Amino acid sequence: MIVIGVPTTGSIPTRVVGSIQNVLLNRKDIMPFYVEGSLVYDARAKILNYARQNHADLLFVDSDIEFSLDAFDRLIWRDTDIVSGLYFGRREGINDPIAYKTVKPQTLFRKKACVEPITEFKPYMEVEGVGLGFCLIKNHVLMSFSDKINPFEPFGNLGEDFSFCLRCRKNGYKIMLDATFTLNHLGEYAYNAKDYKGGQ
């Protein structure tokens, strides 16, 4: 069983709805679950708890990520603790991949988080941090967190996604990136791999 969990502020583009419908029509044992709210880390925690209650793996899909059935199948096929698809930021001129080779949190001596971008992609590679826009997390990972904490609570100046990755790595889980496909990050313009300038 896989829960497709979508945190949303209230609306989802039809292209994303179409992506999810395509999976529901062509694959079995899939449950969509949508949570509306302005605090994304609370929405993600509600989705995580829903997946745990249903003894399911969890595929986070952000409400601005368009994906194909092939992309869905590739994540499932990887059969690993945590695996993300590759997508890129959607700000003009700053559209780096939303995955980082290293992620160092803010500390007393380090005033802000430090991230090291990926400069060379391998088809399948271990990373320290990914955005959760298209990320499959196995149920045993979800179950490893106490009910009393929100694993998405921002840590220092890291966002909820990288804070979650940090906690997962502290629990001994690897975070993998499947770069054999890319996703569309929707806005007024669909940013994807062809827009990436390689850190220039």
PLM region spans:
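Active-site nucleotide-sugar/metal-binding loop of Leloir-type enzymes
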Residues: 45-57
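Conserved catalytic core of nucleotide-sugar-dependent glycosyltransferases
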Residues: 48, 68-153
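Short beta-strand-to-loop acidic/aromatic patch adjacent to the donor-nucleotide binding site
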Residues: 54-66
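Short, high-confidence coil segments that cap the C-terminus of an alpha-helix
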Residues: 55-56, 80, 173
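C-terminal catalytic/acceptor-binding lobe
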Residues: 144-200
